[in-house]
Amino acid sequence: MKAILTHPGSAHKDDFLACCLLIARYGLPVWRRDPEPGDLDDPGIIVVDVGGEHEPERGNFDHHQFPAEHEPVCSLSLVLQHLGLYEDARTFCEWLEPTEWFDSRGPFATADWLGIERSVVNRLNSPVDITLLRRFAQKRELEAGDPVWEVMRMVGEDLFMYLRTLRERLDYVAAHARVLEVGEGDETLKVLYMPRTDPMPDDPSSGLSRYIEQTGAEIDGLIYPDRRGPGFGLSRHADNERLDFTRIAGEEDVHFAHARGFVAKTTATDLGRLAELMVRAKV
């Protein structure tokens, strides 16, 4: 394979991120110019966001030829589909659908779809967005060693890693976590408990909230291994105000309770004691 080709001029998040993924996957240079005769027919050139053709088998990923009533889609969507990542990305990357809307419908229609004032859209930009897109737009060619190309490779690698490891993490949570009911009567709390396993994942609490979203379980709080010690972390789920962990700050085996009451750390490992602490934290 030779290169990734995308249009010159201004750059947007969709073509930038599509190129990031392709750089991470194939390690190719990027050419920023209009396609020349034969580029679309050359399987060694991946044509992104330009060319008027969506032919993945030939490496062509443009969406501008789709009719106006076509569902919101962008070049990033097409590349994610080709890489087999689209469904997970739509599920786990909340920013993807607004990106599709923004690129295919524009900022005003996107604001209306989101139910926000149109002025809010510009408030969501940051120097990270502005600088990376501007520096990318200024380039005619990018290759390994160029600072912009290297940052794009890192962005693509991190997105690949996030989607791959999150799916693995959800499978891990499903295999080990269980829902507990602690307390009695109206005082009952539903808690998702993640036991300590061997080996332990790097971040034991990672994926718990996503798992709850996927299963639709009604959960008040979480109990999970503390990655900094042998005990456990206790926290609210979705900032559930039925739990205030400042209420257990004075317990002998509680060594940390956040002043805002949403999380605590304990040296306790016995499940009965952990359940008792959750009940005592109930408002």
Predicted segments, located by residue:
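Acidic catalytic cores of enzymes that act on phosphate-bearing nucleotides/polynucleotides
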Residues: 121-201, 217
